[in-house]
Design a protein with these regions (language model features):
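Glycine-rich phosphate/adenylate-binding loop
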Residues: 21, 109-116, 121-129, 136, ...
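Conserved N-terminal Rossmann-fold NAD(P)-binding element of oxidoreductases
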Residues: 27-29, 52
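Conserved S-adenosyl-L-methionine
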Residues: 43-48, 136
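Hydrophobic/small residue at the entry helix of a nucleotide-binding pocket
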Residues: 33-34
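Conserved SAM/SAH-binding loop
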Residues: 98-106
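N-terminal charged helix/coil linker that caps or initiates catalytic domains
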Residues: 1-25
Length: 244
């Protein structure tokens, strides 16, 4: 019987799988985008996950959040995420923080402990502080921009924050990061014009999920090195062709 990670190993190779197993990734926010980041990282074999979110699962989350089901309503999202990761990859060590990342809670975290930081939170102040703290620690970070009020999952792009366009959240982030002297920030953003502007953004299942999977893909490729993942994939394809 194949191991659960065998198909991934065929693409990435044993050495890269071992590197992922040693990697520690912090995910801030495990909702619509962040939940899918956690899902994909766990299924790729990342060995250490630090998950931060103070929210509990609500019925309104079910339309788009992978952790939200009828059976998880009322549960802290990070607890639901931890249990799901353990069901996927029992070897993954998961640490949870049932708090929001805010100025008053920032001292709970030492960013030097992480190999990568994922920002999937909603507040501009939190996103800015995450960028500042990760940059100060020299830890790679990727930030998710707005995924609400959108219907086109093919409109997502990966870019530096200063190369973004259309996204209202990215516009605010550009201005505030420039004020803080932060010269670069890798982001996933959408070039789709928001469909509506309201107090509560509309959402659909197939948009934040795609954003989260793109974020996770960038994390894995950066952890392993772009060239390493390309060469491993090419080698795997050659082996498959030789067996035909």
């Amino acid at each position: 019987m194949e191991s659960w990670s065998e198909r991934t190993k065929q693409l990435l190779g044993s050495e890269n799988m071992e590197k992922l197993a040693r990697s520690r990734v912090a995910v801030f926010g495990v909702g619509g985008v962040g939940g899918y980041v956690v899902e994909a990282l766990a299924r790729c074999g990342v060995g250490f996950l630090d998950l931060t979110d103070a929210d509990v699962v609500a019925p309104s989350n079910i339309n788009r959040q992978i952790l939200a089901t009828v059976s998880t309503i009322g549960r802290p999202k990070v607890e639901a995420a931890r249990d799901r990761v353990r069901d996927i990859n029992p070897d993954c060590r998961v640490k949870i923080h049932k708090i929001f990342y805010l100025p008053e809670t920032a001292d709970h975290f030492d960013f030097r402990e992480y190999d990568y930081v994922v920002d999937a939170i909603d507040t501009v102040s939190g996103k800015l502080m995450l960028a500042e703290q990760a940059k100060a620690a020299g830890t790679p970070i990727i930030s998710s921009m707005g995924a609400g009020n959108k219907l086109d999952p093919t409109a997502f792009r990966v870019a530096d924050i200063y190369e973004t366009k259309v996204c209202p959240l990215a516009k605010v982030m550009r201005r505030e990061l420039r004020r803080r002297g932060i010269e670069a920030l890798k982001v996933v953003y959408s070039e789709e014009e928001p469909l509506k502007r309201g107090r509560t953004p509309g959402s659909v299942s197939f948009v934040p999920s795609v954003a989260g999977l793109i974020v996770a893909g960038e994390v894995v490729k950066d952890l392993l090195g772009r060239e390493a993942t390309r060469l491993s994939s090419e080698l795997s394809l050659c082996r498959m062709e030789s067996n035909i």
